[in-house]
Structures are given as structure tokens and as C-alpha cells.
Amino acid sequence: MGKIILTGDRPTGKLHLGHYVGSLRRRVELQNLGDYDKMFVFMADVQALTDNADNPEKIRQNIIEVALDYLSAGLSPEKCTLYIQSQIPEIAELTTFLMNLVSVSRVQRNPTVKTEIKMRNFEANIPMGFFAYPVSQAADIAAFKATTVPAGEDQEPMLELTRELVRRFNQIYAPVLVEPAIMLPENATARRLPGTDGKEKMSKSLGNCIYLSDDADTVWKNVKTMYTDPTHLNVSDPGHVEGNTVFTYLDTFSTDEDFAEFWPEFQNLDELKAAYTAGGIGDMKCKKLLNSVLNKMLDPIRARRHEYEQDIPEIYNILKKGSLEARETAAQTMDEVRAAMQINYFEDTDLIQSQAERFRQK
């Protein structure tokens, strides 16, 4: 069995820095390392529709936005398979079969489901598709026999449910499906980058995002208003770096080379932190450094995006080709699933012959 990695995003909006450090940057690294036999990256439009059923146009428009973000960030259709979830009907079929192997109470115990139901005010009227999406996620993974799923800690309950369903299927029918392992982000900051306002999560709905496609002026506008240390009222005052969003971002994005280029007075971030803590460093100077660091990183991403935007039909061709390739893989898995469940009636020649013999002997 080969090493297969699978990951994706809900296409409900353009991708931001939180997506980039949480998963996208790591995906590009994994793709380029070449340690995996196959890499699948998909846009989960079916899942996005579970809480956007009345607004399919939102999903339709954002498919291309996410695809552009994928490609401009460095994902290559030559090295990974990019596809759209809804174009793989085998996933829906496998979801139906897996639903028979899990109880409603088991899905209800998933803490991520509980949190998202509350966040969307679904307590009194939960759409069935939304409630059952963890089973659909399990099918997403199992259909491609993924061995590794990069995800945040909040997705561990989903991965555990996937493993349970895979084990139960294999025990009841045949050892066809593969139990996946989670790959967590390498550091705590990458697991959840705070919003520019200091809130725990960067979110479009909170208006605290910096998007990968934002121009330099927009980036500066967001950095300039970024939450810092509310007690650091004067430049001479000692500052606090803990909980200071500017320093959280510098921890995540800056390098020693950035200091040599943009603030040679300091050799690295540790030296700047020490000086800021001692007093004498203004917040605006730190924000200007962060702005330079972010734009240096985003410049090539924006340039690639501009190039891809000149040929949108080709982007759809890439997604179509990837979806066809992904469907071939999922279809092969489903052939094995149906055979294991003994519902491959027309391919089971032994069944046909035995039934014919039984009726001949009547």
C-alpha cells in the first residue's frame, strides 16, 4: 500500500493567512518533498452546501477563488491532484454505506460538530446534511485510501470517527479500507493564527483577515490597525510580546534574513523582543517591519495569481482533469467496497451461476 495524503478546504471564500500557515504552506512543502506516492487536494463544495444550501452561487463563485489561491501558493497539478468534491459521486455512495455503521448518538458526541452547530445557530433545526457531514468526511478520506490527513487538533475527533468507521467496515465485510493518521501542524501558532484584531481565529465573518490575494495597500491597512499591547502607551514604556498580535505574526513569518534586509539594527526576532520588552521600541516600527515581511512573502504569490487570472478556462481544465483522475481512484475503491458488501451483482459470476443452478434443480 502506498503513502497517500489527502486534504482540502470548504470553498466559502478566498484563502487567508490563517489557511496559509495552518495548512496550505505545509501542503506545498509536502508536495515538493515527494515523500508521498499520491497527494489529493480538493474543494469540499458538497460539505460547504450543508450550511449554504440556499446560496449555491456563493460556492460556485468561490471554487475559482480557492483554485487560484492553491495554484498561486505553489500547488502544482503536475505533483498533486486538484479536484472538486461534487464531481466524485462515489463519495456520496460510500457516505451512504458508512452511515449504516454509525449511530446518531456517536455523531452527536463529536465536539467539533457540537461547536459548529452552536456557532451556526442550528440547535433547534439542524439540517441532516450538516449533522452527518463527519460521515461524509470519513468517506472523503476512505474513498482515496488516504494514509495521512494534515489537519488541526480540532479535527482529531473527525479522524477518530473515520478510523472507527474504517475498522467497522473492514471487520464486517473485508479489509478494503485504510485507517488514516492525522498530521498536525508543526507549531502552535500554525495551528491557529489569530485574527488581526487579536481574536483567537482569523475569519472572514469577523473581518479580521489578511487574504493571500490582498494588494500591498490592503495588507498595510490591516497591519496598521493590528492589535498590540494596550499597556504600551508610550515608546519608552516596556512592552509585552505575549498576546501581542504583531509579535505572534513575526514569530510565524519573519526570518533572520528579513531583519538583515528591513531592520539591521537587530540580528533576529529575539533581539527585537528583548528591546521591545525593555522599552524604547514603538509599535508602529514593529508594524512596518511586519508589513515588509508579509509583502515580501505575498509578492510572488500575488504575481503568480495575476498570471493565472489571465487564463481562467485553463484553471477549469486543471480542475476537470484532476476531478477525472480522482474519480478513477474513488471508482476503483468503490468496486472493492461493493464486492466486499456483495452488492456487485452483475460482476459476481459465481452468484449468477449458483442461482442459475439452484433454479435448474427445482
Task: Map each language-model feature to its residues.
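Pocket-edge structural micro-motifs
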Residues: 7-9, 84, 145, 195, ...
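N-terminal Rossmann-like or analogous alpha/beta NTP/dinucleotide-binding catalytic cores
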Residues: 2-139, 296, 306
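Extreme N-terminus of proteins, especially the signal/transit-peptide cleavage junction
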Residues: 1-3, 346-347
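Conserved nucleotide- and phosphate/pyrophosphate-binding catalytic cores
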Residues: 163-362
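A short secondary-structure junction signal
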Residues: 109-112, 146, 174, 205
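A broad detector of the eukaryotic-type serine/threonine protein kinase catalytic domain
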Residues: 10, 47-48, 144-149, 207, ...
